Amino acid sequence: MSAEVKAAVARYLDAVAGGSPAAIAALYAPDATLEDPVGADLVRGRAAIEEFYGALAGAKVSTELLAVRAVAGHAAFSFRVTTDAGDQQYVVEPIDVMTFDADGQITSMRAFWAPGDMVVTPA
């Protein structure tokens, strides 16, 4: 199961880098939850999750997996996400914790990061 979970994490990072909210949301189960960052309002359901990722539409985004641990339908992983937005570049290295169903869809995602973790530089 851990190989399948690691593959699902890779698909998620590829989808985030692709910048398509619909493609990202398709990786989630219909009744999945998302908390990004931890402490923010809980986002529930695929449609709401697609809306959440709407900020990425058309943005130039890259991702890099830094570490992943996967076991029994769960994954904890750190990664770097770089977003070029006009004249500024945003870089953050969150730690995401996800759970997956038997079909490999994300059932929950919690992202551990705070605004102070984001580095903003001129592009």
From Swiss-Prot:
The residues that cross the membrane are: none
Which GO MF terms does the UniProt record name? steroid Delta-isomerase activity
Q: Which residues bind substrate?
A: 96
Q: Biological process GO terms, please?
A: steroid metabolic process
Q: What domain of life is recorded for the organism? A: Bacteria
List the active-site residues: 12 (proton donor), 36 (proton acceptor)
> Which keywords does UniProt give here?
Isomerase, Lipid metabolism, Steroid metabolism
Question: InterPro entries under this entry?
Answer: NTF2-like_dom_sf (IPR032710), SnoaL-like (IPR037401)
Which chemical reaction does it catalyze?
Answer: a 3-oxo-Delta(5)-steroid = a 3-oxo-Delta(4)-steroid
Q: What is its EC number?
A: 5.3.3.1
The record describes its quaternary structure and partners as: Homodimer.
Q: What is this protein called?
A: Steroid Delta-isomerase
- In which organism is this protein found? Nocardioides simplex
